[in-house]
Amino acid sequence: MDNLFSTNHELILKTEMEKLLKQKGICLWLTGLSGSGKTSIAKYVAKKLHTKGFLTKVLDGDNIRLGINKNLSFSEADRMENVRRTAEISKLFVDCGIITICCLVSPKKNMRTLAKEIIGKKNFYEIFISTSLEDCEIRDTKGLYKKARRGELLNFTGISSPYEEPLGPSLNISTKENNIEESSKILYNFVLPLISELR
């Protein structure tokens, strides 16, 4: 790629964007099994932050796969690419001072490590939404676990593909001990001090 040249040095700095918005641009990377509550928690927190005057963007795995990543399958390589693209998009938002909440199963440690490397360690917070496989199967609002059990979905995390739990996440939220609203409040209380220092 000798014909490509970065123009990042010509752009407005992240710190200037943050001053304008009066907030810190960070990424909350929500990881957990399908049906663990990632998207529900993200939406709650985004709405709560909006009422306080914070600019946020939720990047939901399903929505991303219906758009920019619709050409990707659920193979190991495509899952990695799904994470890579989402992380690159998140970085663009974060560099504009926007609080970005990514909701992806991202089942492997190396996938989440890649996301952190792209977004930047100081801007990346890994949030583990800890929900048992049993509870996720009981919820199964999309019917995906039933399909996976019948063999209709290949490489489905938790059934035919493993999930590697984060060993040292920035925050571990157990939905067994807390319902969705309580879990959302835990995340809200965690993120508020991180983004408020310019106010």
Residue ranges of model-derived segments:
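Extreme N-terminal, non-catalytic leader segments
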Residues: M1-C27
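Residue-level preference for the first positions of well-ordered beta-strands
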Residues: G25-C27, L55, I99-I101
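Hydrophobic anchor at the beta1->P-loop junction of P-loop NTPases
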Residues: L30
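The conserved Walker
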Residues: S34
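Conserved lysine of the Walker
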Residues: K38
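Conserved substrate/cofactor phosphate-moiety recognition/catalytic segment
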Residues: K43-E88
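ATP-dependent NMP and nucleoside kinases share a basic, alpha-helical "lid"
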Residues: G67-F74, D78, S90-R149, N155
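Small-molecule kinase domains that catalyze NTP-dependent phosphoryl transfer to phosphate-bearing small molecules
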Residues: S130-I186, L194-R199
